[in-house]
């Protein structure tokens, strides 16, 4: 059974500088499907991705070999620099190199960010899609 974790919703959003509807990410871990689904909203920064990765590592059902679908379609802005991409790939990423990863994008900027992550990972098992259904089908193969 999948468990949905909404980051920061338990905290007072205004105390963290967020409006109540501006939660940076929510994720669910489905151990039966061996899959993690993360939805980023508002803006994506290296700090928000690191926070997601830390929460995910602490989840008792998470395994680094699970597949992942990263849904970027609701993000308004991606604030990542070249050194952020390197840090994400080398230090923050909680998944093993063998894990299948799918990015679901809506804009060219989201597509470029996903492509950068794919380039920096040692194995080329990251794909980019425009629909959630295509991404899920590919990850589950």
Question: Regions from the language model: what does each represent?
Answer:
Residues 2-141:
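Amphipathic, Lys/Arg-enriched alpha-helical "gate/interface" segment within cytosolic domains
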């Amino acid at each position: 059974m999948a468990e949905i974790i909404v980051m920061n919703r338990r905290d007072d959003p205004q105390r963290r500088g967020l409006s109540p509807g501006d939660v940076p990410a929510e994720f669910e871990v489905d151990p039966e499907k061996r899959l993690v689904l993360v939805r980023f909203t508002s803006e994506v920064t290296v700090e928000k991705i690191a926070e997601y990765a830390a929460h995910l590592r602490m989840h008792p059902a998470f395994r680094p070999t699970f597949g992942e679908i990263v849904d970027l379609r609701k993000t308004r802005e991606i604030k990542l620099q070249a050194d952020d991409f390197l840090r994400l790939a080398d230090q923050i990423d909680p998944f093993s190199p063998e894990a299948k990863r799918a990015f679901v994008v809506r804009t060219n900027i989201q597509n470029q960010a996903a492509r950068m992550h794919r380039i920096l990972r040692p194995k080329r098992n990251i794909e980019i899609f425009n629909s959630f259904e295509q991404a899920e089908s590919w990850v589950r193969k």
